[in-house]
Amino acid sequence: MQWAAASFVYFACVLPSVGQQTSPAPASAQQSDKPANAAAAAPLRLTLQDALDRARKNSVQFQAALTNAGLARQESRQAFDALLPSVTYNNSAIYTQSAGPVATAATGVPVVFIANNAVHEYISQGNVHEAIDVAAVANFRKVTAAAAVAKWQAEIASRGLVVTVTQGYYGLASAQQKVETAKRNAYEGDRFFKITQDLEQGGEVAHADVVKAELQMRERQRALQEAQLGFLNARLDFAVLIFPTFEDNFEVADDLHAAVPLPTLAEVQERASRDNPDLRAALATVQESNHGVFGARAGYFPSLTLDYFYGIDATTFATHTVFNGQKFSNLGSSIVGTLNIPIWNWGSTQSRVKQAELRRNQAKRELSFAQRRLLAEIRLLYAEAETALNEQEGLSRSAQLAEESLKLVTLRYRNGESTVLEVVDAQNTFALASGAYQDGAVRYRVALANLQTLTGVLTTP
């Protein structure tokens, strides 16, 4: 009993002190977790350049174009290597049945297969091989031109990706602005509905005004929901485009309405004529087809192969052979030259030449079309960008006037100087003008991105 009492007193004294020492730990841990949670919750702020860098890393189509360009470069390297001498080391052992009862393999013993030299034959030789072929040279030039085509096609994909990212980036910024405008319109619709109710209770307006105001309020609420849905769609589409994993904790910089200068038409024409990837790809395709015709015609020419061998080809796997008490070296060398002269192949070479000429003619047509299209696109895309820029000031002014008109018409309605239809019309006009202002800004940015598909330079704020 005394032991139990002493134990009770001990734990009664010790446990509270232990609890006092350990209890502050969770509080400090919670305090240390708060900054981490706050940092984790902070959205990632993206500029247009950030979005472009991420999209280049994660775009499947763009990476596929880069992969094709890399494959084409390797094919060009392989074609060049095929023009150089190659070295191999051949090792083989041939065992052939003898023609008679011979116990051991010896030089001169007849064998069943006359193509073989002895019962036992060991070959261990280094072989230097070189093929001198006009078709191989033409093939190297052809695949080099094909690599240039793939390179410019990758550049086309890169510039097209800029258009896609720009459209998604500023489309998201525009959708966010439209949500704010829709909230403002919903607030104005709700406020006007309350105004009509108050005026109806005072006997100043008819109940028809209240009904019309309620219809307008509900329409503005539906418009807000649609704007929020459009913002969600734009946000998710943009996230899929630029992030390797699903990520929605980000925001874009608010520079949709920042002033961006338009380059002059002369600058666009000069850069487009020098750096247009479509035109460069078409030119490289014509070069590829020209080399294809030359390669097909190379089928009429003879080809030469040279082989140099050094090593052993003996009945024993050794560098020396002893015969009749004399020692002979098995090491030796030989050179083989083969000249292949084409004579007759039932017109296959002529058919390949015809195919290559058809491809070349089509490539020339596509080059001519690319040149005409470039001239037309320079004028068309520049006119689009210039028109969008010129409309910016007017759209901004229209949005400001629509907002001011809404305030004045609502005030006049409260004073009994305007009708409910005028207020509804002012609200609709403000919604349309605000949306047109956002769409006009996106249109100008996308027009600049389309211009960079010709020039390779994206104009930014």
What positions do the PLM features span?
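Periplasmic alpha-helical coiled-coil/stalk elements that build and connect Gram-negative outer-membrane
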Residues: 160-273, 384, 388, 429-430, ...
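Amphipathic alpha-helical coiled-coil segments
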Residues: 64-79, 157, 161-180, 191-193, ...
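Bacterial N-terminal signal peptides that target proteins for export
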Residues: 1-11
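Outer-membrane beta-barrel proteins
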Residues: 76, 85, 131-136, 292-295, ...
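Acidic, low-complexity, intrinsically disordered peripheral segments
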Residues: 9-11, 15-23, 28, 40, ...
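Small/polar, glycine/serine/threonine/aspartate-rich low-complexity segments that form flexible
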Residues: 35-44, 90-132, 251-265, 294, ...
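Amphipathic alpha-helical coiled-coil scaffold segments and their short linker/junction regions
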Residues: 52-56, 110-111, 205, 209, ...
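Bacterial Sec-pathway N-terminal export signals of envelope proteins
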Residues: 21-92, 98, 144, 252-287, ...
